[in-house]
Amino acid sequence: MFDENSNAAGTTPVASSLAATPNANLVSQVFNVKDSRWLQVEVCREFLRGQCARSDQECKFAHPPPNVDVQQGRVTACYDSIKGRCTRENPKCKYLHPPQHIKDQLLINGRNHLALKNLLSAQLNQTGTPMVNPMMALQQQAAAVNLIPNTPIYPPYYNGMMYPQVLQDPYTAAAVNQVLDSNQEYHSPPTDKKNQQLQTAALLGNVGGLLSAQSAAAFMANSSAAAAAAQQTPSPLLRLQRKRALEEENTNGNDMTSAAAAHTQLLSLAAGAVPMKRPTLDKNGAMLYSPVAQQAQQFNPYLLQTLQGYVPAVSCEYMQPPPF
């Protein structure tokens, strides 16, 4: 049968190890203070009003006699009566002598209370965890961070955008080379063809004896000078394209500069357009907040790229191309 005094045997090893336990004061308070909450029984409300038709042996609530003290609708059962050794007769015992069915329930409550008490003592008697050096913890954290690979981490929805390398079509490559040759021939002056024609005519003339050696040398010098001058002087079409590119670049730069200036001016006007009438003052005369309008800070998600695995917010509303 449950006995509250049996805690004395269980507390001897606990008391011997109090000096080595960091929670010695708490353990001593737990075992030295008696908790009588498990002995409390609720009083029948109908019995208090004089309307309960059941006897004290049938009602599951207590029917205390007049000599028992009732506090907040509850009474405390006599522990000696539960053990069968209460001898208080004059004056009568101020605690409840419960019937058998309430006594059985109180014994169950006592066993549960003792088990909880022993579990709490076991938890408090455990040796404390060793203190962790903060410098060692920081070093371990830095080592764990260095183990993370520096390669970027791509989400799964980026895999469809990375296509494998496709072999080039030989017919397409030949067509591209032909287009490049024709463009080069169009943009550069036709000096090579003229030189080839003149060299052919000179060879034919030398064969027929029409040109002398001096005329041939003069012809070769003139042709080389003409070729050098043609290389230094670009074609009119190429000069026109360069001029257009410079004009477009200057126009775009001026447009962007003017747009940025207008945007900044609008922001400044919007920030100072509605001044406050007067600042709110505290009881001591200090302002609660500044009456000057603060400029809004623009959020830049790319400032967080120093974090490993960070991917800026992107829109995925586009149609993904079909796989090849």
Swiss-Prot record:
PANTHER family found in the cross-reference section: MUSCLEBLIND-LIKE PROTEIN, PROTEIN MUSCLEBLIND
Gene Ontology CC annotation, any one: nucleoplasm
Record flagged with keyword Lipoprotein: no
InterPro entries: Znf-CCCH_Muscleblind-like (IPR054429), Znf_CCCH (IPR000571)
Claim: Nucleus is one of the keywords in the record: yes
Zinc finger (C3H1-type) stretch: 38-66, 72-100
The entry's keywords: Metal-binding, Nucleus, Repeat, RNA-binding, Zinc, Zinc-finger
Protein name as annotated: Muscleblind-like protein
Species of provenance: Caenorhabditis elegans
Outcome of gene disruption: Reduced lifespan.
GO MF annotation, one: zinc ion binding
Stored PROSITE patterns: ZF_C3H1 (PS50103)
Family the entry assigns: Belongs to the muscleblind family.
Organism superkingdom: Eukaryota
GO BP terms in the entry: regulation of RNA splicing
Cellular localisation: Nucleus
Expression tissues: Expressed in neurons around the pharynx.
